[in-house]
């Protein structure tokens, strides 16, 4: 078994509300290097930890985390639509392994995924189908949330499973860092919004377009006095990156969900995917060497935008 890790932010506003050209050029260069790394590694399996943004998972049944044996992209925000090349039998085997190790993961045989999963696959592989993949979706936007220690434990068990494989495995985490887009909360929501959050699958093209326009509008004023959203917090982001660089993964056990939401934004909890990915790497091969490939707070994209890579020592 050989394993590598990439963790990176995603943003639905890429190409829709862009920052200055020099910032885009920086990000493009970083992603080009990451793609080259993936190409050279040529993974035989990708395990991706990703969030959902009320496109596949809703409050009618909201699991803290779910593994998919089949997945299809909804194609939101300029991402590719269509099926992912999910390794069904191996995903089932992984689900059984996780359950046998006392982590109560949910299972989906027909999961819809959104840009939170697919944008990173596109950016690193150019496709949704180039490599076999196992998606694991971690609830990161719909409170109440599982504590961070459970996310770390999930990653550890996935890493233990990966260690049994005779494959080149790429582990991906996608989301964060600090950010707060206009994602509604169920508590106190008007009836129509509450109904969407409970069972809003398969919206009309008009409804999806309206949702996209609201996000674009939020991006145009994000970080200014006109925005009601929690601003980006570069200090929090850098401290989180340092934690991963130093392999202090057990420190996340003390993370306060309420404090993170207040200090860095409610959607910052997408960093759970990074926690799971690094925990998987550490459990699969022990110590690791990590690299801060890029970080920049980008208001136009509503993202503390970061990229990290890691491999066993």
UniProtKB/Swiss-Prot annotation:
One of its GO terms (biological process) is 3-phenylpropionate catabolic process. Keywords: Aromatic hydrocarbons catabolism, Dioxygenase, Iron, Oxidoreductase. Pathway: Aromatic compound metabolism; 3-phenylpropanoate degradation. The active site is at residues 115, 179. It comes from the Bacteria. Its cofactor is Fe(2+). It catalyses: 3-(2,3-dihydroxyphenyl)propanoate + O2 = (2Z,4E)-2-hydroxy-6-oxonona-2,4-dienedioate + H(+); (2E)-3-(2,3-dihydroxyphenyl)prop-2-enoate + O2 = (2Z,4E,7E)-2-hydroxy-6-oxonona-2,4,7-trienedioate + H(+). HAMAP family: MhpB. This is 2,3-dihydroxyphenylpropionate/2,3-dihydroxicinnamic acid 1,2-dioxygenase.
